[in-house]
Structure formats: structure tokens, C-alpha cells
């Protein structure tokens, strides 16, 4: 069989290369060989018929929880990678809040070995900022980088010590690593379980004020100014955080940000509308309509650089409890494109900006070799049917997690083929619609 693959007749949208039009993508030896309007295909070459579909660089997710090692009952590297390619993601960054925490080469190497064995999405480990993510002592950043980590995070836990955060930014700068941080002041969070506002009052649930996020973002931007370190703000959810990041960028500081599909599409009112469903419990919590508008505008104008899923699978035991006691987080790899395509249809995003925020935008944040269909680039490609409608059935998801707020929803937009390094690693089963 020929080692050449042709993706024919699709609308190629590649913001990194400035391409948007019907083209044929030619893949040879795992690399993009050509993107052209007219190419003659040899008789023995393989082909994907992409007519009436989008062809984009494979999506890049800066924020996923693969749970391995230590929590394989929730997810494994293999099942998470399978969910990723089903959603069009060819590269994912694995957060370090595993058991044990990824604060050393041994854990990083295990994650990479599991990813290689799965042979699906590319997995880029993120190492811990502090040993055990306990916020007391810095991890060995040189060791983490040498073993394959692309960024550092204590995700799920904020770095409460300003002194430690300062040292982390300085130390990480020496190794060229960004810090991707979970921003919340635990003293303001207290025992809150949802956004502090009228909805929380009506529901009788303890609230988390927006300022819990805002003050930490402002603190860390000040520390970036002091140290010159690179800061990436994870799962931005408030208008105040957006304003702070926008101003930091205006001043030329090395600050970037991401936003999740659920913080773009849902509000705190959805908690009550769902009947206290724990599939609507996450951290940061779903915010107000004003916050959602601010996040949408920030993504559209480039203040926020990337869409990231914060894919967080949990077992039924951890979710099928009262709202206060339930684990935070939802799965998102397989629904992200569909949910965000809804924003395009509402006029909140352009098609080009959507693709950019899922491809070259995140790739640039962590300096990953991804997000483009330029000649010579790795042939990581998503073929997408923007018109296909499907019903979200948790039992049909590839992730072990079933915790999705989109359960039973009819969504539009489906990944039909995912290609990694020139290999077709996912083809849609239309029965899943």
C-alpha cells in the first residue's frame, strides 16, 4: 500500500498558513507534502473524501486530565487519547494531578510510554510547579523538562504563596517553561460550590465570588512583571480576569489565557435548570451571563489565546452524590468542537477564529510543533462535518467518564476522521449519531 494519503475536496481552514478554501492535502511519510487546488492522485494512493467537510490542523488541547497513574478507574492515557482523537484532537497536554503527582522524570516517562503504546493522540506531559503540588517546595524543573514536560502547573490547586510563585516564575524562566496556573484565592473560596450570585442564593448553595479568581490573576501578572516569567492562565471564567489579561497583553507582558467550552456556553443559571445535576459542577464554577459575554469577546478578539477542554473524567461514585459533595469537573474532548461551533452559529465567533483557537493558538502558547498544515509539518489533521447532527449519549463516549452536561443534547458538528503523523487513527461510526 502506498505511504501517501490524499485528503480530497474539503474546505481547508489553516489560520497558521492563511489558507481557507477548497484544497487537496497530500500527506507523505507522515508529513504534509502539499496543499493545493489541483493534484493528480496516483491510482494506488489512499484517499479520504472530504467533500462538504472542513479540513483543519489537528486540534491541540492545553488542559486535560488523563488520570494515569493512580486513578485508572476514572481514565487512562489510552482511553483519554481515544476520546481525544474522536473529538479531532491530535495533541493533548496532560495535567500533573495524578497519583503520584507528576513532579519527577519517572512519572513523566510513564505517561509518555503509555501514550506511545496507545498510538493515538500525541501526549505532552505538564509537570508540577511544586513537589506533590503541595505549594511548599519547588519541583526539579530541569529534570521535568529533560524528561519531556512542556509546561508546569499545580492544576487543581492554586499556588497560594506569593513568594513561592515568584521563585517558580524565575526558575521556570531559566528553563524556558511557562507556568499554567489554576487561579483562585482559597480564603475567598471557602466552602463555596458554585458561582456567588442570585442563582446560588435561590438554590441555597454556598457561592464562590468572581474576585477569588480576579485577585490571583492580578497578583500573578504583577509577579510576571517582576520576574519576566511566562504565565498562562488556565480556564479563565470571569470578566475581571479577562480585563487583567487584556491589560497585561497591552503592556507587552508574557501572559496568555485559555477558556473552556462550558465557560463559553453555560451560566450559573444552568445549575438550577438542570435540577442540581452534578454534571454542572466544576472549578472554576459556571459564572454569570456577564462573565460569559466577557469570555466570548476575549476569545473573539484574541485576548484569550486558546480553547481548552479541562477534560476531567470522574466515576459515577464521585458524581452520583449531593451537589455539595460531588467532585468538580466534566469530560469535554468529544463535545468541544460541537459546543464551540454553536458559538459560530450564534455569531459570537468566526469559523476562522474557532479553528485558530483550537489549533495554532494553543500550539503557540506552549511552543508545540503542531497547529499547522504547512509543507513539512507533521501530518496531524482533523476532518470535520460541520453540518452533522448527533445526540450526546454518555454511554457512547470513548472516555471512561460519563460526566457531561450535554447529555441528551442534540449538537451539530462532528469529527469524521483524525490523522496523526499520516495515520488515520479515528473514523467516525455514524451509528454514534
From Swiss-Prot:
Residues reported to bind Zn(2+) 1: 63, 65, 155, 310
Alphabetized SUPFAM superfamilies for the sequence: Composite domain of metallo-dependent hydrolases, Metallo-dependent hydrolases
Taxonomy, superkingdom: Bacteria
Positions contributing to substrate binding: 65-67, 97, 283, 314
Catalytic residues in the record: 310
Keyword set includes Cell inner membrane: no
GO terms, biological process: 'de novo' UMP biosynthetic process; purine nucleobase catabolic process
Pathway assigned in UniProt: Pyrimidine metabolism; UMP biosynthesis via de novo pathway; (S)-dihydroorotate from bicarbonate: step 3/3
Record EC number: 3.5.2.3
Residues the entry annotates as binding Zn(2+) 2: 155, 182, 235
Known catalytic reactions: (S)-dihydroorotate + H2O = N-carbamoyl-L-aspartate + H(+)
Family: Belongs to the metallo-dependent hydrolases superfamily. DHOase family. Class I DHOase subfamily.
Role of this protein: Catalyzes the reversible cyclization of carbamoyl aspartate to dihydroorotate.
HAMAP family: PyrC_classI_B
Protein name according to UniProt: Dihydroorotase
Organism annotation: Anaeromyxobacter dehalogenans (strain 2CP-1 / ATCC BAA-258)
